[in-house]
Curated annotation (Swiss-Prot):
Coiled coil: none annotated. PROSITE patterns: ATP_GRASP (PS50975). One of its GO terms (cellular component) is cytosol. This is Formate-dependent phosphoribosylglycinamide formyltransferase. The lineage of its organism: Bacteria, Pseudomonadati, Chlorobiota, Chlorobiia, Chlorobiales. Pfam families: ATP-grasp, PurT_C, RS_preATP-grasp-like. N(1)-(5-phospho-beta-D-ribosyl)glycinamide binds at residues 12-13, 72, 277, 348, 355-356. Involved in the de novo purine biosynthesis. Catalyzes the transfer of formate to 5-phospho-ribosyl-glycinamide (GAR), producing 5-phospho-ribosyl-N-formylglycinamide (FGAR). Formate is provided by PurU via hydrolysis of 10-formyl-tetrahydrofolate. Gene3D superfamilies: 3.40.50.20, ATP-grasp fold, A domain, ATP-grasp fold, B domain. ATP binds at residues 104, 145, 150-155, 185-188, 193. Homodimer. Signal peptide: none annotated. The gene is purT. Pathway: Purine metabolism; IMP biosynthesis via de novo pathway; N(2)-formyl-N(1)-(5-phospho-D-ribosyl)glycinamide from N(1)-(5-phospho-D-ribosyl)glycinamide (formate route): step 1/1. Belongs to the PurK/PurT family. It comes from Chlorobium phaeobacteroides (strain DSM 266 / SMG 266 / 2430).
Length: 389
């Protein structure tokens, strides 16, 4: 039976999800705060509202009467989801999961205090004065993040007391939602960051994708690769942690569970209840299902017989370097001239410095050197130039 799916947030991850569910025959309303967002370009209907406005959110839900609501971003009045669930609407993964994971304080306290997971030492601060005290307790270097933000917005590293003023002002400029509060995390001396894509199903066991390695700058991913080399014991531990936290949050869908790998072991970092930006590497055909296809199947209650690695792959971000509109792209011929490569241009209508506008993809046979594949993706990303008016 055809489902009516409302997507809240219509960026590049949402675009690929829409394509996946449209291929399965479903109807999609794509919602965002601006018109012509990437997912709106491939959806059946579109709405443009401020999703932090509860009345506006209620109005479009009442107008369209969706069967399923799929959040893609943090800046949503997520407490409304509990009411929608009571009305019989499926919220993905669940209203509880969406509310907990849209706020770093809720998910960190759940992970550390309730579930006893190992995390970086952390404190919270709701003012510049509290931030100074929190940093004094945590020590430097440390990372300051808004409780609600994505793609590294508002995130900075404090190395000395002189950085505190900037850290506070930057966190406030990059936050989403109403809360001014930030989380202060002690720096973990990790050697690898991984994402463990975890799939919870309505009528099946929890499944795991092969681990994805990634590198970040300014809190935003720059490259990702799959598989990431990790010991069997650490992988098993990561899977146990991912299953524990997703079971607590409840619901069906894909989750991006992030970990730090350090010399002294594994640290839980963050969790997203939706396809993960680092998981765009699966668009390179690394698995038998992309993360978006897995999300679609899990959300719709369709079977996922198994997840298997098909080949080695990598993704690298194509970013803008200035503010503008009507972006154009050059260098595609050169980038696509390399064998075993591909590219995705997201279709965002405007640019700004560091804004992610596309990704290059590279792949090779199973067992190939992942560093070589990653280098190819990075080299191709540098060939693509973004211009705008």
């Amino acid at each position: 039976m055809q489902k009516k799916i409302m997507l809240l947030g219509s960026g590049e991850l949402g675009k690929e999800f829409v394509i996946a569910v449209k291929r399965l025959g479903h109807f999609v309303i794509a919602v965002d705060s601006y018109n012509d967002a990437p997912a709106q370009q491939v959806a059946d209907r579109r709405e443009v509202i401020n999703m932090l406005d509860g009345a506006a959110l209620d109005a479009i839900v009442a107008r369209h009467q969706p069967d399923v609501i799929v959040p893609e971003i943090e800046a949503i009045r997520t407490e409304r989801f509990y009411d929608y669930e009571k009305e019989g609407i499926q919220v993905v993964p669940s209203a509880r999961a969406a509310n907990f994971t849209m706020n770093r304080k809720a998910i960190r306290d759940l992970a550390s205090k309730e579930l006893g997971l190992r995390t970086a030492t952390y404190r919270y601060a709701a003012s510049k004065e509290e931030l100074k005290r929190a940093i004094g307790e945590v020590g430097v270097p440390c990372v300051v993040k808004p409780l609600m933000s994505s793609s590294g917005k508002g995130q900075s590293t404090v190395k000395t007391e002189a950085d505190i003023e900037h850290a506070w002002s930057y966190s406030q400029s990059g936050r989403r939602g109403d809360s001014v509060e930030v989380i202060v995390e002690a720096f973990v001396p990790f050697h690898t960051e991984i994402t463990l894509l975890t799939v919870t199903q309505k009528n099946g066991p929890t499944l795991f994708c092969p681990p994805i390695g990634h590198r970040q700058e300014r809190g935003d991913y720059q490259e990702s690769w799959q598989p990431c080399r990790i010991g069997d014991a650490q992988l098993h531990e990561a899977q146990e942690i991912a299953e524990k936290v997703t079971r607590s949050l409840t619901g069906a869908g894909i989750w991006g569970v992030e970990f730090f790998l350090a010399d002294d072991g594994l640290y839980f970092s963050e969790l997203s209840p939706r396809p993960h930006d680092t998981g765009m590497v699966t668009l390179a055909g690394t698995q038998n299902f992309t993360e978006f296809e897995l999300h679609a199947r899990a959300v719709l209650g369709l079977p996922i017989p198994k997840i298997e690695l098909l080949r080695v792959g990598a993704s690298a971000v194509v970013s803008a370097d200035r503010e503008g509109k009507n972006p154009d792209y050059s260098g595609l011929e050169e980038a696509l001239g390399e064998p075993c490569t591909d590219i995705r241009i997201f279709g965002k209508p405007a640019t700004r410095p560091y804004r992610r506008m596309g990704v290059t993809l590279a792949y090779d046979e199973p067992g190939s050197d992942v560093d070589t594949v990653k280098a190819k993706a990075i080299a191709n990303a540098r060939k693509v130039r973004v211009t705008s008016e």
